[in-house]
Each structure stands twice: as structure tokens, then as C-alpha cells.
Amino acid sequence: MADHFRNIYSSRASDYHRLIAPEDADGHLARTLRRLIPPGQRILDLGTGTGRLPLLLARDAKQMVGLDLHGDMLRENAAQRSLSIAHWSLVQGDMRALPFPTAWAQVVTAGWAIGHLRGWHPDDWQTQISRVLKEMRRIAAPGGVIVILETLTTGSLTPAPPTEGLAQYYAWLESEWGFTRETLSTDYQFANVDEAVERSEFFFGAEMAEKIRANGWARLPEWTGIWSKRA
């Protein structure tokens, strides 16, 4: 599974963006982020991917920079930026060692990114994720906001961590690092069932495709957790 996601992020970024474009059909994510993040802030987005958070936040930011490890994701991000009225900068790098000075940003975000380290480094995930969290804390100015978004399952009518490993990571964020969790419905709204399968199967797999068909889901249920804290 680790190689599955790495391969997508390194070579199928445009397909990935086609998948996520119809996410958050009811706008819960956008409204929650606007509540947590005041306008006029300098924002650093880690694991920025194809631009999911910059597309939501950059227009109201004083400055926004997105960082990602994968060049293909950054190229698709730049393509999406060219279609947007907002602007943000892009940097290739590792979120465990950030090329920014201390207290550089008022807001540091990481969307659907840090959790991969739980699977990619099963034997020392706490060490690896701690490196990211310490860097987020270093970059965030005093009184700033740190926001982490992760999956709470796709294809279920109730929210829950999709794996035991992620459940451990989420609980650890709260108990050891003092983050507070909010749970949001962020369903995908596709035109029809066939489109839902066509756009999502490469990422979520054949079992999910069959579940979509069996339930007639043009609207694919999804849940997202938002963990936040003050710097």
C-alpha cells in the first residue's frame, strides 16, 4: 500500500486531482478552515499535493507557500494555480526538514500528508512524525495556528480511522501533542455512478469500486478529521 500511494503521487498527479476536485460537496471543509484561519495570514502548506488547500486558502492569505516532496504533484499544483485567481509559491522539499526560518508563518497546515508516515515507517513512525510536528511548531509564530487534516474513512456512513495504525497516530496527536479534533463530512459528488468509479478506482481500489456500484453512489461518502492547536 505504501508503494501504491507513492506511485500515484510521483506519476499520476493529474488523475489524483480529478479525483479530489469534487470533494467536500457541502463546503464543510472550506467553512471550517475559514473559521480556524483568519484572513491576511502567511501560510505554509506541507504536503501541498495538487493544490487542495491553496485553492481554498490562498485568495485570503497575505502569502502562501506550498511544499511537497513529489515533483509530479507540484507540476499539477502549478497547473491548477494557473487556472486560479489566487497566487501561491511552490517549493520541493521534505516536511521533516523545512527550508524556512523560525516563526516564519502565522499558519502551518498539512493536509492528508503526515499520516502516510505512519504506514511508510511502521517501526519508527513516532520519531518520523515527531520530526514533522517539531518543524511545524518551529515555523509557526507564537500565537499562530497549526492545522492537520487526515482521513476518517471513505466509503462509510460513519467516521472512523480506516486503519489501526492511523487510529494510534490520531490518538497520539491528541494525547501527546495537545491537538483538538473536529470531524467533518466531506463527501465527493460525482455526476453519476460510472464517473465515481472511473475517477476513484485507481486510488481506492477495486473493492471500493464494487461498493460504489452496489450502493449506487454518485455521492461517495467521506469523512475528514481536522486537528488544530495554537503554536
Question: What annotation goes with each model-predicted range?
Answer:
Residues 42, 143-145:
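Short glycine-centered segments of the SAM/dcSAM-binding site in methyltransferase folds
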Residues 127-142:
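A short glycine-rich, Lys/Arg-flanked "PGG" loop and its adjoining helix->strand segment in the class I
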Residues 106-127:
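A short SAM/SAH-binding and catalytic strip from SAM-dependent methyltransferases
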Residues 1-39, 145-172:
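Conserved class I S-adenosyl-L-methionine
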Residues 50, 180-231:
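Conserved Class I S-adenosyl-L-methionine
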Residues 96-108:
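A short acidic, Gly/Pro-enriched loop at the edge of an enzyme's catalytic core
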Residues 44, 50-97:
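Class I SAM-dependent methyltransferase SAM/SAH-binding core
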